[in-house]
């Protein structure tokens, strides 16, 4: 006998449904993900309960989910042979937005059983995602172990109420039929549904099946009859999660094929790590380092992050909460049993659990790179060529791992004589001179400019190695990486060289004597250059060049000024310190000039030469050329 009743939803469902349908989900095709997830959840519940009551299987222990579409009627049906629901269960679980039978089910579990129970759907809104595409939803369900005439019919148009009736249903489980809106009829297509299943539910452990039509008898090419085939249910998903299998059972080829599947990359990955974490947070991660950088890696709007699965069900792409920006090249996934999600299952809750998992995964990736650098330097150079500049963002972004990231950086160096960035900070430290306490470096516009900078002259003479940096990000990097393993990084273009014990007593005495002898010359140049410079000094870093400019301690460097200007940032006026080399013939002859006008011209010429060498350009190149021509003409005979 029919027992139809009309119920109002237990919360302000009309408003909540409207909010969810229009705001909660970012793409409507995930309604199928949610419903398949619920169906797989029901199958897992039955599997668990049947451990102690095998009769619940009712002679059918092959658990599965079946999906079918009817183009003419504009419907999609998702059917499972899982645990099903009673009338009270339907009213309770389908009548309340924030209710989830799964969450209650977890409360009844204890011990190791709860660890193994493959349950998903912590939030009750998943079912209501059906209304994103459906104008009406019909649910037919019978709880396992109940009589056929105790089945339930639930119907709603998502407008704030629903009807419940008693029906007869021979098979246990739940059948959900979506009556699609006119503008959503694209989903009543088998191929469309198959593509969604492959995308979102490929690795659910329960088989997801679709009906494959049979073929009539036909004539073959050689005249023989090709027999007819009957229609059958065909499994659409792989029904196995590769990352949940033992590493020993997975071949390199399988890992590489899976990488291509999740990344859409055509080339093999450089390396990977497959790991299960147990403890306060339990999750599995499968992480890949690609061999090639994506073309849009530097696009700030490009999404990055890991694929997120909960119990092998795909939740989202680009879960950036688990991966810092400087590791945005990493591909892979994370699968958790108890990961906290917000109510939409789209955006992760930013809490201590998420942060702890992010910390663990970050350390895992850094460990992968450290091992690669140690075991295969050539392969690491391949990685560095593709992703090194991104990794250089790390010290500014990740203070906790700054030292580890610094150990992974690679630079060109005066030691190798090559432009290839192959030198690590540990390599540099291993070659430091006795008494050397600093790591010397220079940042310039190009490798050639850095390698040929006059600032290196004294250091080269003493055999002191200098790191050569010429990437745009290097100045930013060095502002956040001031020391490594208690060794300060020191710019050879800023302030004093601070050679310390590398300078012997005789050299110090000679330098002091030269400075005393040049006091008058320094004062004359100061007067000639006026406000063009912050100061004039006798250099301690030049041997073959007449003069150079340096930034004062605490002042903005030339490269940082360029970086800010390129970003459209206001830059304060910075006057350089002008260092002269009295031992150079040009400076020596300058000191002999009695004509103050000529002295000023030559002083300006040397200053602008030094600025051109340091900056690669001048604020007023025409004035420089005019002065140069004037000086050439005056000295031509």
Curated annotation (Swiss-Prot):
UniProt lineage: Bacteria, Pseudomonadati, Pseudomonadota, Gammaproteobacteria, Alteromonadales
UniProt-listed Pfam families: HATPase_c_3 (PF13589), HSP90 (PF00183)
Taxonomy, superkingdom: Bacteria
Protein name: Chaperone protein HtpG
Cell compartment(s), UniProt: Cytoplasm
Species, as recorded: Shewanella baltica (strain OS155 / ATCC BAA-1091)
Role noted for this protein: Molecular chaperone. Has ATPase activity.
Primary site of residence: cytoplasm
Region called C, residue ranges: 563-637
Annotated gene: htpG
Region ranges (B): 346-562
Family: Belongs to the heat shock protein 90 family.
GO molecular function: ATP binding; ATP hydrolysis activity; ATP-dependent protein folding chaperone; unfolded protein binding
One cellular component term from this protein's GO annotations in UniProt: cytoplasm
UniProt-annotated stretches for the region A: 1-345
